[in-house]
Regions:
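N-terminal glycine-rich phosphate/adenylate-binding segment common to multiple enzyme folds
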Residues: 1-15, 96-108
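Short, flexible loop segments at boundaries between secondary-structure elements
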Residues: 122-142
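Short, glycine-/small-residue-rich phosphate/pyrophosphate-handling segment
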Residues: 22-59, 137-145
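Active-site rim beta-loop-alpha module in soluble metabolic enzymes
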Residues: 37, 43-94
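Glycine-rich beta-alpha junction loops
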Residues: 32-36, 59-62, 106-108, 129-130
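Short gly/pro/ser/thr-enriched loop/turn and capping motifs at secondary-structure boundaries
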Residues: 14-19, 35-38, 129-133
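Extended, basic/helix-rich recognition subdomains
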Residues: 85-117, 121-123
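Short hydrophobic/aromatic-enriched beta-strand-loop microsegments
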Residues: 4-13, 27-31, 115, 119-128
Length: 145
């Protein structure tokens, strides 16, 4: 706050404390790579040890890995979407999560299907921007988001 005079929303992870408070349950964080999302990232986003989270990544999704290994290949988005749905269901059933946070900026297109399939609240970078725009005067004028 001392560095610049405007609010900064740098990560969708900033929504995790609110999701945990709203549901009273664990938040399932889905990220591109679980091994690269460290405890330090979580702490810097205000996710303390008292906030229950489960982090899962797309590290084992071959179709998702094409993004990095074979960037010129065509992706089958339905395969990625189905993988995410199965992951979300497992988080819901086995890990007892009450909400989902899509940490990667490539994941918002899948949010609605995850909501439909799990009936859980699903937040992502786009939902964070919508919230911000609704909070500021004149923010509703940004209809493109």
């Amino acid at each position: 706050a001392a560095a610049i005079p405007v609010p900064v929303f740098s990560s969708s992870l900033l929504q995790v404390p609110a999701l945990a408070l709203a549901t009273g349950r664990k938040v399932g964080i889905i990220t591109a790579s679980a091994k690269h999302l460290t405890a330090e990232h979580l702490r810097n986003a205000g996710i303390t040890e008292g906030i229950p989270v489960v982090v899962k990544g797309l590290d084992d999704c071959p179709e998702w890995q094409k993004l990095h290994k074979y960037p010129n290949d065509r992706l089958d988005l339905s395969v990625i979407e189905d993988y995410l749905v199965q992951m979300a269901r497992k988080l819901q059933q086995s890990d007892g999560v009450g909400s989902l946070l899509l940490e990667c900026t490539d994941l918002p297109p899948f949010a609605e299907r995850l909501r439909q399939e799990t009936s859980l609240p699903v937040a992502d970078y786009v939902s964070m921007l919508h919230w911000l725009l609704k909070c500021v005067p004149g923010g509703g004028a940004c209809r493109g988001l």
